């Protein structure tokens, strides 16, 4: 089996050498042809010796070679399982499989040895997507989107053994009605969030990792008119709005990793960051841009975009709802957009209209369930007398932590009314949650 893998990999590498113009789809098609030829020659040779080989075995062999060329080899079945949420690999022998229902199982070895495991990751990084990525001694970390849509992060050299984590976004095609069905929002929130998008207001979706920020952004994006010209910008393509068939004019933009020596600007040769791409995106005559996740320096052009565009959205990792504005200010000052807290606050109030906070309660370790829901929707009203942002929680947490209407909006009231939003929805002060939050320990997080 390993000989077949290596033969197909060598032929594929020779085919791609010096040619960077093929799309991932073209590379996959070429790889399938090469794999089929290699497997067919192997089966024919065995049959010529008189060995009986079933057709089903030939297909299984082909699937295994393709998993080696374009997938994660022995890990591929786990990453393809729709019930699996995370796969964690620590060295070739230790595999942890985390299921959406909270189960944790030990998987079979990921490879024969660490070297083979690294080869698998390096191969899929180089052939699996349009913007080639690498995992090397000089570039010991890797972040990428796998062909099946899962997200992969990997490290080596700086860790005792290669580390790989894959994460599945189990809900790709989703709208706000689906979010009501998932009990992540209630009908009141559903109508309000739709109005926010239709009113072209700028939004940050914040929350801890795994709280459903990206899924909610996908759902809110379905309220963007189908024919609107807009962009998504990500370090690794993850939102997938260009793949749903629901948008005629969405442009997915992905950052490009650099390789080799550092240039005069201190960046690896060939690197194109989101920070660099933002100014050019602003010149494409778009109304809005959606950024999958703001982590670092891209916070600066993101707020520049929000200052000049309408209806933009991004996600941000924050542990607590009351820490969102401070986290934004911290990033703006760290990356040079402001030299004081007051300067950061001015940037925030000029650019941002709403903060939506997504929370998570995970009681699986004590025999319960995992719950993801919106807990806050906060309007950024303006700058207060103390040179701090004035905000008001249009929705705030009820006794169980889930969002309930609190007050009517101030700054954005007219814009929301122009979308047809009925303010009477906000008089449902108990909310309209379709199911109780079935927690073992009462109260919010």
Region annotations inferred by a language model:
Residues 203, 219-349, 359:
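Switch/coupling sub-region of P-loop NTPases
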Residues 206:
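Residues at the beta-strand->loop junction immediately N-terminal to the Walker
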Residues 213:
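Conserved lysine of the Walker
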């Amino acid at each position: 089996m390993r000989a077949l893998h290596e033969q197909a990999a060598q032929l594929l590498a020779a085919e791609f050498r010096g040619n960077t113009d093929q799309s991932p789809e073209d590379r996959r098609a070429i790889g399938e042809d090469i794999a089929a030829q290699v497997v067919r020659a192997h089966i024919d040779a065995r049959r010529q010796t008189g060995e009986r080989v079933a057709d089903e075995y030939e297909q299984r062999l082909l699937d295994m070679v393709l998993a080696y060329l374009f997938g994660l080899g022995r890990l591929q079945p786990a990453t393809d399982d729709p019930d699996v949420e995370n796969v964690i690999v620590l060295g070739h022998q230790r595999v942890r499989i985390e299921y959406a229902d909270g189960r944790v199982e030990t998987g079979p070895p990921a490879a024969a040895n660490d070297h083979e495991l690294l080869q698998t990751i390096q191969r899929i990084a180089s052939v699996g997507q349009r913007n080639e990525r690498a995992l090397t001694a000089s570039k010991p970390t890797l972040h990428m989107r796998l062909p099946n849509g899962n997200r992969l992060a990997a490290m080596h050299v700086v860790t005792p053994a290669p580390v790989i984590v894959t994460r599945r976004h189990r809900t790709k095609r989703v709208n706000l009605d689906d979010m009501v069905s998932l009990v992540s929002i209630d009908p009141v929130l559903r109508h309000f969030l739709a109005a926010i998008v239709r009113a072209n207001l700028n939004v940050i979706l914040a929350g801890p990792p795994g709280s459903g920020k990206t899924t909610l952004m996908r759902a809110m994006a379905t309220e963007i008119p189908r024919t609107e010209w807009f962009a998504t910008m990500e370090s690794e393509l993850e939102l997938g709005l260009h793949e749903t068939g629901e948008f005629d004019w969405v442009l997915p933009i992905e950052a490009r990793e650099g390789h080799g020596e550092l240039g005069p600007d201190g960046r690896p040769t060939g690197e194109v960051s989101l920070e660099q791409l933002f100014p050019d995106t602003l010149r494409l005559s778009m109304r809005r841009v959606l950024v999958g996740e703001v982590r670092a320096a891209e916070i600066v052009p993101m707020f520049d975009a929000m200052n000049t565009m309408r209806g933009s959205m991004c996600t941000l990792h924050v542990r607590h709802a009351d820490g969102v504005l401070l986290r934004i200010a911290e990033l703006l000052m760290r990356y040079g957009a402001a030299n004081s807290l007051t300067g950061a606050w001015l940037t925030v109030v000029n650019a941002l209209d709403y903060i939506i906070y997504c929370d998570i309660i995970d009681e699986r370790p004590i025999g319960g369930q995992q719950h993801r829901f919106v807990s806050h929707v906060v309007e950024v009203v303006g700058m207060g007398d103390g040179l701090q942002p004035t905000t008001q929680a249009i929705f705030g947490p009820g006794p169980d932590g889930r969002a309930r209407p609190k007050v009517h909006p101030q700054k954005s009231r007219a814009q929301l009314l122009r979308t047809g939003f009925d303010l009477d929805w906000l008089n449902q002060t108990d909310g309209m949650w379709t199911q109780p939050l079935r927690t073992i320990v009462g109260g919010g997080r």
